[in-house]
Amino acid sequence: MTQSPRACSAPPARPLLIVAGPTASGKSALALAAAQRFGGTIINADAMQCYADWRIITARPTPADEAAAPHRLYGVRRLEEAVDAAWWRGRALAELAAAELPILCGGTGMYLSSLVNGIAPIPDPGPNARAEARRMLAADGPAALHAWLAARDPATATKLRPSDPQRLARAAEVLLGTGRGLAAWHAAPRAGLAGYRVMLLLLDPPRPALREAIAARFEAMLAAGALAEVAAVAARAPDPALPGLRAHGVPELLAHLAGAISLDEAASRAIAATAAYTKRQATWFRHQKLADQRNTHTIRSRLTDSTQFSESTVRSIISFINLSS
C-alpha cells in the first residue's frame, strides 16, 4: 500500500537557540534567562569552560546557576585531555538530541560554526605525529616551525602567524600524520546541521561597556580565588603547550606565580589581552552566518540579568519555537 505524502514527510525541524557574543558580554545571563523562561537546556560552546580545572578563571556558571536550569558540557575534561572542535561537535550533537529545547551558549566561534556549518573531515593524526610536532616546536621555536611548514604546505602556512605556536603545531601534526595539509582538509566538502532550525541571539555591546565589564570580572575572579585555582594547576607542572593554559588570565597569573610580574601587572595584562580578544570575537560574529537573517537578533547592550530580556525578543522566540512544533 502506498503511503500518503503526509506519512512520508520528514518530521518538523526542531528549534535550536544560540546565544553568542564576545567574552563578558552577558551570554550566560541571557542563556539562563531563556532556559528558565522557555524550559531549555544550556549546552556549553566555550572551549575553556569545558575544562574541569577552570571554574573561576573562565567564569563558568555557578552551582546556583546550574541548579536553576540544566547545563551540559561544562567542566567535563581534565586540562591534560584534548578538547577540539571535532570532539566538542560530537558531544554537542548528542546533547542537542537529548534536549527538549537546546540552547547553545558560548563565544568559541569555531565550535559554533563547526556545528552549524559542518567541520573538515580531518582524521586523527595520531600520538606519534602529535609528539613529533611538539618536539619540533620545543626544539626550534615557532618561527622555525612556520618555515618548515611553508616549505611543505605553503597554503596552510600563509594563513598562520609565525608567532602562533599552538596553531603551527596543529598544522604540523596534521601534515605529518595524514600526509595532507590543513588548508586542503578545510577545502573538502562538509555536512552541516540537519533537522534543526536555528535562532541566533547575538550580544554585541559597546566596547567601553565591555572593557569595563572585563576589568570588573577579572577583579571578581581574583577575589573568588582565581590565583589559587591557577596555582593548583601549576603545581602539577603541566605541559606548557597544553591549549587549556591559554585561557584568559592564566598566562598572566602563571607569570606572577613564577615571580616574573606583580599581581597588579598580571591583572592589567590579562584585562588588556581579553579586551583585544573580544574585539576579534565581535568582528568574527558580525561576518559569520550562524542563522538566517530573519532569525538573528542582535542585542547592543551587555546583559546582566533577565530584566533586560526585551518583550520583542521574547515574542520572537515564542513564535520561533511554536513554528518548530
Swiss-Prot record:
The UniProt site entry described as Interaction with substrate tRNA is assigned to T108, R130
Domain of life according to the entry: Bacteria
**Binding annotation for substrate:** T23, A24, S25, G26, K27, S28
**Which co-factor is required?**
Mg(2+)
GO MF term (any one): ATP binding
Coiled coil stretches, renumbered = none
| Matching Pfam families | IPPT
Q: Which reaction does it catalyse?
A: adenosine(37) in tRNA + dimethylallyl diphosphate = N(6)-dimethylallyladenosine(37) in tRNA + diphosphate
Q: Does the record carry Transferase as a key word?
A: yes
Region annotated Interaction with substrate tRNA sits at: 166-170
Where on this chain does ATP bind? G21, P22, T23, A24, S25, G26, K27, S28
InterPro entries registered for this protein in UniProt: Dimethylallyltransferase, IPT, P-loop_NTPase
Q: What is its EC number?
A: 2.5.1.75
Check the record and name the SUPFAM superfamilies matching this protein: P-loop containing nucleoside triphosphate hydrolases
| The UniProt record lists the keyword Transferase | yes
Q: Which GO terms describe its biological process?
A: tRNA modification
Question: Enzyme group, top EC level?
Answer: transferase
Q: Alphabetically list the UniProt keywords.
A: ATP-binding, Magnesium, Nucleotide-binding, Transferase, tRNA processing
Stated role: Catalyzes the transfer of a dimethylallyl group onto the adenine at position 37 in tRNAs that read codons beginning with uridine, leading to the formation of N6-(dimethylallyl)adenosine (i(6)A).
Query: Which PANTHER family does the UniProt record give?
Result: TRNA DIMETHYLALLYLTRANSFERASE
Assembly behavior: Monomer.
UniProt name for this protein? tRNA dimethylallyltransferase
Q: Which organism is it from?
A: Acidiphilium cryptum (strain JF-5)
